[in-house]
Swiss-Prot record:
Gene3D superfamilies: Transcription elongation factor, GreA/GreB, C-terminal domain (3.10.50.30), Transcription elongation factor, GreA/GreB, N-terminal domain (1.10.287.180). Belongs to the GreA/GreB family. PANTHER family: TRANSCRIPTION ELONGATION FACTOR GREA (PTHR30437:SF4). HAMAP family: GreA_GreB. GO terms for molecular function: DNA binding; RNA polymerase binding. Keywords: Coiled coil, DNA-binding, Transcription, Transcription regulation. Necessary for efficient RNA polymerase transcription elongation past template-encoded arresting sites. The arresting sites in DNA have the property of trapping a certain fraction of elongating RNA polymerases that pass through, resulting in locked ternary complexes. Cleavage of the nascent transcript by cleavage factors such as GreA or GreB allows the resumption of elongation from the new 3'terminus. GreA releases sequences of 2 to 3 nucleotides. Disulfide bonds: none annotated. It comes from Caldanaerobacter subterraneus subsp. tengcongensis (strain DSM 15242 / JCM 11007 / NBRC 100824 / MB4) (Thermoanaerobacter tengcongensis). This is Transcription elongation factor GreA. GO terms for biological process: DNA-templated transcription elongation; regulation of DNA-templated transcription elongation. The keyword Transmembrane helix does not apply. Transmembrane segments: none annotated. Residues 12-74 form a coiled coil.
Length: 157
């Protein structure tokens, strides 16, 4: 059996929307590009055709990936998110003692991680270190830039 893909409800909706978009809009666009490229004649030296076929392969691969992820999805119910300790689906406010600043992270499954928006995977160094910890605890985490110290200030949904 495949490993479950842990998602928040929001993450599930985003993946479903992406899948729908790829199946309805992008498939049709690429099919049209292939049709137009075929009209140019000789396919052996037709870069437009090759490009469209590569795009089609990428889209079909992404569709297959999304379908597999959704098939194995385990959605975290907001009511199941514990607030007494850090768990997947919660938002954690920490004080970064190394850089002397407050930072908020939302702990999510790796499928919906988006570090640029402070959504970090439960498998990332910081996410892994925060899991199971409580407000008031301080942790040291080894990250690519070195070791950072984080004090947990707040846990919420």
């Amino acid at each position: 059996m495949s490993k479950p893909v842990i998602l928040t409800y929001e993450g599930l909706k985003k993946l479903e929307e992406e899948l729908e978009y790829l199946k309805t809009v992008k498939r049709a666009e690429v099919a049209e590009k292939i049709k137009q490229a075929r009209a140019f004649g000789d396919l052996s030296e037709n870069s437009e055709y090759d490009e469209a076929k590569n795009e089609q392969a990428f889209i079909e691969g992404r569709i297959a990936t999304l379908e597999a992820m959704l098939k194995n999805a385990k959605v975290i119910d907001e009511e199941d998110i514990k607030l007494d300790e850090v768990s997947i689906g919660c938002t954690v406010k920490v004080f970064d003692e190394t850089y002397n600043e407050e930072v908020e992270y939302t702990i999510v499954g790796s499928a919906e991680a988006d570090p640029m928006n402070n959504k970090i995977s439960d498998e990332s160094p910081i996410g892994k270190a925060l899991l199971g910890k409580k407000v008031g605890e301080t942790i040291s985490v080894e990250v690519p830039a070195g070791v950072i110290k984080l004090k947990i200030l707040e846990i919420r949904r």
